[in-house]
UniProtKB/Swiss-Prot annotation:
The keyword Electron transport does not apply. It comes from Rattus norvegicus (Rat). This is DNA repair protein XRCC1. There is a cross-link at K178 (Glycyl lysine isopeptide (Lys-Gly) (interchain with G-Cter in SUMO2)). Scaffold protein involved in DNA single-strand break repair by mediating the assembly of DNA break repair protein complexes. Negatively regulates ADP-ribosyltransferase activity of PARP1 during base-excision repair in order to prevent excessive PARP1 activity. Recognizes and binds poly-ADP-ribose chains: specifically binds auto-poly-ADP-ribosylated PARP1, limiting its activity. The gene is Xrcc1.
């Protein structure tokens, strides 16, 4: 883009004796234009161009100015510089923030304004005069002005269509910017990593050629010679894991193509009764699975049985497909680990109970979510259900792990039919006698509300294996911890009011503790607590966005988060344009001025405003609790 030459200075409102306005005409010097004295709020200069030009872009080098505005005009009317009407070419642009102006930091910022930053109506016309207006309202300690200013006309059509291949040098005041050719073979950031990825991709693309040749060789050989590769593969056990994987894939392909080789899979069929063993000793299953992977020399007939017993990596995400879980009573980091395992198995996660939720995974009974889901008739299970499904790599019936809720469903029935009868038969008699002891032990620790029939039957624990010891330790760690994101005080208050209004249903005698489906009947026959409407919390913070700034004493930050969430407000993790209220316990901060410059509608309030709204149960004027600058 050609640079527009400047002829002379038409007028100037203020200039220093050394740093005069004529310095803006001299591109090869390091001189500047500054105001005559410090403390002037606004200074301006009018420059005459060589001829009328269309201005395509503007380069401005600052020298202490907070704001710069560029206007354009024409001398054809014969009016003087003071009487002439100017049009805005570049709206007032910020070069220094208030804090930078007071501290004097970054006074020489350079900004390049392209055609997208200029006012289109003025940029499309031709002008021969330019007026530059600088202002510095934040500092009165030093004079200010500009280091340089450059105007560029639109590029020629020939340049736009065929840009020159020469290396050009652009001069911005005292800096020379070298524009490198894109075709030059230079080392760019991240180039080494991209090359490594490309090399790995090309290497992986060339790998399948080996197995395809081996497959052709094996297909050409006779069925009797198929046993000869076994010592080869066994001898290459010290190599990397990739070659054995490729050979196992070949074996799978040969099993599909060669029906005569399938009778070799017949002898392992009597090993079917060994399937219940992993359920009794679950620790042996993870150890045996890597062992089966690590032995590449195993015959094809034996390799087919463990492959069908465990889910492959692509099937892991489908084990809990269609399940929507909600967690209650767990504390980080175990809470996040449990959630990640459920998501890895294909389940979906919700922070609160929603109509599409299917399972509430509870650490212990009588949490707020436990009472809510129990009243809605949802399914409440223990965490061992997710842990066992993750360890066994298959979906287990959730009714074995029920704490409360629906006793059976089509989902559980489908799972039980898919499992072998030999697996389920030895488990049920061994697990059933223990729920009573656990229920009696949990009774004294529960609130004084008499348990309903659902709660007396609810804690029917699942398999009491090695994972139970780990689970009980984590339960001890989770006990007494509140759910992150739960407004537990409000939910507990609502539950207490509901208990005082309606006495609990009398216990039904003679129920079979082993019949899981009776829970569904009790929900429909006995008067359900779900029939009573739960009082809703007011939502006077709806549509309002809050940001917590600074330090808060004690657990005040946690209380503020709970109140804002309870009254349907939204908390922002970072300062953004959406924030409307900044809650702080500190005095006025200089950063607040910068935030107000970016977002004039911000309000800085004390935490007492949130507490007062909670006490009155309505939205109070925030102006009474505002944080204002001190005189």
């Amino acid at each position: 883009m050609p640079e527009i030459s400047l002829r002379h200075v038409v007028s100037c409102s203020s200039q220093d004796s050394t740093h005069r306005a004529e310095n803006l005409l001299k591109a090869d010097t390091y001189r500047k234009w500054r105001s005559a004295k410090a403390g002037e709020k606004t200074i301006s200069v009018v420059l005459q161009l060589e001829k009328e030009e269309q201005i395509h872009s503007v380069d401005i080098g600052n020298d202490g100015s907070a704001f710069v505005e560029v206007l354009v005009g024409s001398s054809a009317g014969g009016a003087t510089a003071g009487e002439q009407d100017y049009e805005v070419l570049l709206v007032t642009s910020s070069f220094m923030s208030p804090s930078e102006s007071r501290s004097g930091s970054n006074p020489n910022r350079v900004r390049i304004f392209g055609p997208d930053k200029l006012v289109r109506a003025a940029a499309e016309k031709r002008w021969d005069r330019v007026k530059i207006v600088c202002s510095q309202p934040y500092s009165k300690d030093s004079p200010y002005g500009l280091s340089f200013v450059k105007f560029h006309s639109p590029p020629d059509k020939d340049e736009a269509e065929a840009p020159s291949q020469k290396v050009t040098v652009t001069k911005l005041g005292q800096f020379r910017v070298k524009e490198e050719d894109d075709s030059a073979n230079s080392l760019r950031p991240g180039a080494l990593f991209f090359n490594r990825i490309n090399k790995a991709a090309s290497a992986s693309a060339s790998d399948p050629a080996g197995p395809s040749y081996a497959a052709a060789t094996l297909q050409a050989s006779s069925a009797a010679s198929s046993a000869s590769p076994v010592p080869k593969v066994g001898g290459s056990s010290s190599k990397l894991q990739e070659p054995p994987k490729g050979k196992r894939k070949l074996d799978l392909g040969l099993e599909d193509k060669k029906p005569p080789s399938k009778p070799s899979a017949g002898p392992p069929a009597p090993k079917r009764p060994k399937l219940p063993v992993p359920s009794r000793t679950p620790a042996a299953t993870p150890a045996s699975t890597p062992a089966q992977k690590a032995v590449p020399g195993k015959p094809r007939g034996e390799g087919t049985e463990p492959r069908g017993a465990r889910a492959g990596p692509q099937e892991l995400g489908k084990i809990l497909q269609g399940v929507v879980v909600v967690l209650s009573g767990f504390q980080n980091p175990f809470r996040s680990e449990l959630r990640d395992k459920a998501l890895e198995l294909g389940a979906k996660y919700r922070p609160d109970w929603t109509p599409d939720s299917t399972h509430l995974i509870c650490a212990f009974a009588n949490t707020p979510k436990y009472s809510q889901v129990l009243g809605l008739g949802g399914r409440i299970v223990r965490k061992e259900w997710v842990l066992d499904c993750y360890r066994m790599r298959r979906r287990l019936p959730s009714r074995r792990y029920l704490m409360a809720g629906l006793g059976s469903s089509s989902e559980d029935e489908g799972d039980s039919h898919s499992e072998s009868g030999e697996d389920e038969a030895p488990k049920l008699p061994r697990k059933r006698p223990q729920p009573k002891a656990k229920t009696q032990a949990a009774g004294p620790s529960s609130p004084p509300r008499p348990p309903t029939p659902e709660e007396t039957k609810a804690p029917s624990p699942g398999p009491q294996d090695n994972s139970d010891t780990d689970g009980e330790q984590s339960e001890g760690r989770d006990n007494g911890a509140e759910d992150s994101g739960d407004t537990e005080d409000e939910l507990r208050r609502v539950a207490k009011q509901r208990e005082q209004r309606q006495p609990p249903a009398p216990e039904e005698n003679g129920e079979d503790p082993y019949a899981g489906s009776t829970d569904e009947n009790t929900d429909s026959e006995a008067p359900s607590e779900a029939d009573l409407p739960i009082p809703e919390l007011p939502d006077f913070f709806q549509g309002k966005h809050f940001f917590l700034y600074g330090e808060f004493p004690g657990d005040e930050r946690r209380k503020l988060i709970r109140y804002v969430t309870a009254f349907n407000g939204e908390l922002e993790d970072y300062m953004s344009d959406r924030v409307q209220f900044v809650i702080t316990a500190q005095e006025w901060d200089p950063n607040f001025e910068e935030a107000l410059m970016e977002n004039p509608s911000l309000a800085f309030v004390r935490p007492r405003w949130i507490y007062s709204c909670n006490e009155k149960q309505k939205l109070l004027p925030h102006q009474l609790y505002g944080v204002v600058p001190q005189a």
